[in-house]
């Protein structure tokens, strides 16, 4: 059943508690358990729910997988009226509406994908108070006609999701979001909230200012996602590196692979498909129907890998994405957090895997500097890129470095990133840097990395012989290091902005003022060793993922039943039950309706709707 299709008749009763059901906190806990099947709130969910449930305003900054949606869904259910949710993407609206309906909540999404008859019916139900939550796009909520509909309705709360779209410096900027501050004047008595999963200090201030939330209470939670393993390595043969990663660590798993260009998206998806991986492309240049179909396959089926540009992701609410891979650099730490945060939203072990190289740095800098953006914006974007490069090149705990960018402190190394698991060290790399920069200077600053490395290693190539570069004093001074090591040196020099690259002239290297400071001994250089990796990769331990005492055969049968039920209901499998619920089901082996209803993620509606089928399977084992 489509999220936009009919579900509730006008006479169907709401699952929300009555106003005499106790305090806001008590009613919220009741809804949390009876509707969503959770026993307790995560911090700071309960504080936020109480704040808005009692009529206050709030700005919520939670990482992906932090339970952000519950922060506006529960206040909407404990207050009288209909909750209005402003969301930027149709897919995101439909996913959340499907999940809410599965839990017995009267929800609807009104968007351009509906026929006029269905839109009018939902508007009528909104005015008549027959909806608990309604999702709309910013363009619709700003239209005078729809605002008249809202004025004739009783609103419980107004939630502006993905609020970072208000930032003109952000990669998801939506001009319509800037105008949403007008809702404060139109509905002064309705509590408002803004929610986002990623925003640095300047973006947070911009959200508060543009949306008129100066009096709002701010709620934040750590950006730490300890279930996601962070890994960033040197790019060598990216497709082969990716395929090895998928085969060794994620066979049959759902995941997202990000590429910078549309052409690389299609090439990578086609190549993976030929190698036996079920891979689908996604980018803005594909026909709308192809994008919709590929996204639906990814959401509703298991073991699908989507290869995409950043056009894919913000509307994805799939909790069982086991990995996010980058074969190209994101634009900033915020983009990296936003994109990798789509992995492991169910709290189970997942991977954020990335490879990058010298050309990635040069390409990103060239794109920023060559854009038509104002100089101020270019400076901001270059600063953000340099912060990301610092994260990529750190020799200390990667998670500590990531969290420090957002002003957080992790007291101890995380133990779940590549730099913790395969320790690297920093060393005084001034001499190596001087050799590399000298090779660039003495060859006239007109060649690329490969030629400079050949000079350093003393390789007699045709180009070196033709240009008589074998006569240079720098020729052969780097024979003590291999080609991978010199590639790492040049990459790190570029990352530290100690070497210029002209992409318009085929990646020629040139020296900057900072380069000359290094050559003259006025600026020391710290480099890091490349991690020494075991030839035999350690494969993911299935027992860690499954948990103790779980029968893999039973879990497979539970997943098969879930898929059957999902097809019957016309929803993605995770909307029926998430992986975490199935794992607990396989481990606890409930035999009675009461035991089943006490499982994580099993609310009253799902216990009634799905309990008999799952209990029949469990009792047969």
Question: Where do the language-model regions lie?
Answer:
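Accessory DNA-binding and partner-docking regions appended to nucleic-acid-acting proteins
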Residues: 1-28, 380-382, 411-621
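Helicase motor core with emphasis on the C-terminal RecA-like subdomain
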Residues: 17-35, 39-43, 47-69, 77-79, ...
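Pre-recognition alpha-helix immediately N-terminal to the DNA-recognition helix
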Residues: 47, 241, 387, 435-438, ...
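Short, charged low-complexity linear segments at domain edges
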Residues: 375-408
């Amino acid at each position: 059943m489509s999220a936009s299709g009919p579900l509730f008749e006008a006479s169907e009763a709401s699952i929300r508690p009555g106003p005499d059901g106790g305090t806001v906190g008590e009613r919220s806990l009741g809804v949390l358990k009876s509707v969503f099947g959770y026993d307790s709130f995560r911090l700071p969910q309960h504080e936020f729910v109480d704040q808005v449930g009692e009529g206050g305003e709030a700005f919520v900054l939670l990482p992906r997988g932090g339970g952000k949606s519950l922060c506006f869904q529960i206040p909407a259910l404990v207050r009288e009226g209909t909750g209005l949710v402003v969301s930027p993407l149709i897919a995101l609206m439909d996913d959340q509406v499907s999940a809410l309906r599965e839990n017995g909540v009267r929800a609807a999404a009104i968007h351009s994908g509906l026929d006029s008859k269905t839109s009018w019916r939902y508007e009528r139900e909104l005015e008549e108070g027959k909806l608990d939550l309604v999702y709309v796009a910013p363009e619709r909520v700003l239209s005078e006609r729809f605002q008249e509909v809202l004025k004739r309705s009783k609103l419980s709360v107004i939630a502006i999701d993905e609020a970072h779209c208000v930032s003109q410096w952000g990669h998801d900027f939506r001009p319509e979001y800037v105008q949403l501050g007008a809702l404060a004047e139109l509905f002064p008595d309705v509590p408002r909230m803004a929610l986002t999963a990623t925003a640095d200090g300047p973006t947070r201030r911009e959200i508060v200012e543009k949306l008129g939330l100066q009096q709002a209470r701010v709620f934040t939670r750590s950006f730490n996602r300890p279930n996601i393993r962070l890994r960033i390595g040197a790019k060598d043969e990216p497709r082969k590196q990716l395929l090895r990663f998928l085969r060794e660590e994620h066979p049959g798993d759902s995941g997202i692979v990000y590429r910078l260009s549309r052409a690389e998206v299609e090439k990578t998806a086609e190549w993976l498909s030929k190698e036996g991986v079920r891979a689908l492309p996604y980018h803005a240049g594909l026909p709308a129907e192809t994008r919709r179909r590929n996204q639906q396959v990814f959401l509703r089926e298991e073991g699908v890998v989507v290869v995409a540009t950043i056009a894919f992701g913000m509307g994805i609410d799939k909790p069982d994405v086991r990995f996010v891979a980058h074969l190209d650099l994101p634009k900033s730490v915020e983009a990296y957090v936003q994109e990798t945060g789509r992995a492991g939203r169910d709290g189970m072990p997942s991977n954020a895997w990335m490879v990058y190289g010298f050309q990635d740095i040069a390409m990103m800098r060239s794109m920023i500097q060559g854009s038509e953006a104002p100089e101020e914006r270019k400076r901001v974007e270059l600063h953000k890129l340099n912060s990301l490069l610092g994260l990529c090149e750190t020799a200390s705990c990667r998670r500590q470095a990531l969290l420090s960018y957002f002003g957080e402190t992790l007291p101890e190394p995380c133990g779940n990133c590549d730099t913790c698991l395969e320790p690297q060290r920093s060393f005084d790399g001034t001499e190596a840097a001087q050799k590399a920069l000298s090779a660039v200077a003495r060859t006239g600053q007109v060649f690329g990395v490969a030629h400079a490395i050949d000079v350093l290693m003393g390789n007699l190539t045709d180009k070196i012989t033709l240009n008589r570069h074998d006569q240079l004093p720098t020729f052969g001074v780097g024979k003590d290091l291999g080609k991978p090591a010199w590639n790492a040196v040049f990459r790190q020099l570029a990352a530290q902005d100690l070497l210029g690259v002209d992409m318009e002239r085929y990646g020629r290297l040139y020296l900057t003022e900072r380069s000359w400071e290094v050559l003259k001994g006025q600026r020391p250089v710290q480099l890091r060793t490349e991690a020494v990796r075991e030839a035999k990769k350690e494969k993911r331990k299935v027992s860690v993922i499954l948990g103790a005492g779980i029968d893999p055969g039973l879990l497979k049968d539970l997943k098969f039943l879930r898929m059957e039920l999902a097809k019957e209901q016309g929803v993605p499998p995770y909307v029926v039950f998430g992986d975490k619920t199935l794992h607990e089901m396989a481990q606890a082996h409930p035999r009675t309706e009461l035991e089943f209803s006490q499982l994580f993620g099993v609310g009253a509606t799902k216990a009634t709707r799905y309990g008999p089928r799952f209990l029949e399977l469990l009792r047969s084992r």
